[in-house]
Amino acid sequence: MPDRLILLRPDDWHIHLRDGAALSRTVTDAARTFGRAIVMPNLVPPVRNASEAGAYRQRIQAARPADSRFEPLMTLYLTDKTSPEDIRTAKAQGFVHAAKLYPAGATTNSDAGVTRIDNIFPILEAMAEAGLPLLVHGEVTHSEVDVFDREKRFIDENLVRIIEHFPTLKVVFEHITTRDAVQFVETSSSNVGATITAHHLLYNRNHMLVGGIRPHFYCLPILKRRTHQEALLDAATSGNTKFFLGTDSAPHARHAKEAACGCAGCYTAYAAIELYAEAFEQRSALDRLEAFASHHGADFYGIPRNTDHITLIREEWTAPACMTFGEHSLVPLRAGEKLRWRLLEEKM
């Protein structure tokens, strides 16, 4: 196995940066590794139009470390009230790269999301015409559906319909967690891609539940059984261009995670590429990490690949037990544990 990896600088095609004082943490950590990142719009209130996206983009840019060229790629939050004109205006701005479908109530700050897929069919048509990709949080929210089955049900009830009705629409099935999702993406057209997180590659529901509940493994979509984890590893390391890096790094203050009703989300941005390297090394596939992290996503979005490089070295280091997060603190994934790869710090 190699002791050093030189990779074309990767991008993160799904990240939560939050807002306000949190940006000093999240933007710094993301910019350490990534050239660009697709920024999720689920703020309070959400980012619903080009004006709000532009203002949020400026706040992110202001939080970048000195001399950083990190580029936030903005997205819109789809609601039942989104209009085709919102889509056309956003596309024309040049800095909005996608729109996000959150089924109402599916995850953090999704209460303003779409209540019925049919409500946004005119919007999806406008997106297809404008060439604006659709990002999908693929879970149904019916109370009678088991939380471990929500992704499969979303495919059957919603995603199949979307793709059949809008075959020219680019769709990213985000943070996939099941063998069903892998198979769906593999057998769909080239307009359908998927992001995979490091934590879904490295962990399954046993890590979260066996021997005590570990709240910092709790995320949505929730960790699944090991057979699904294995399917994700197969997909990520296969070389299939439909699968690419998206951390879904989602920070919450420590008190909000370690609570009787804790928030969903794992914070991985501080060591994202190191965690992916561990996952790929499990499959003896480090030679395929660069394509997954640095090629496939940019190619899917039709954006030029980065031209600079990063270097990873095989060197153990200990993840911080706690990190500052605005006025609070957060506990990152793998807090206090050893990581096997380390990113050499270089300015972009």
Swiss-Prot record:
Cofactor annotation remark: Binds 2 Zn(2+) ions per subunit.
Modified residues (N6-carboxylysine): 100
Catalytic activity, as annotated: (S)-dihydroorotate + H2O = N-carbamoyl-L-aspartate + H(+)
Keyword Metal-binding among UniProt keywords: yes
Amino-acid positions noted as binding Zn(2+) 2 in the UniProt annotation, renumbered to this chain: 100, 137, 175
Role: Catalyzes the reversible cyclization of carbamoyl aspartate to dihydroorotate.
Active site: 248
Protein name as catalogued: Dihydroorotase
Organism: Azotobacter vinelandii (strain DJ / ATCC BAA-1303)
Class in the EC hierarchy, top level: hydrolase
Top-level division of the source organism's lineage: Bacteria
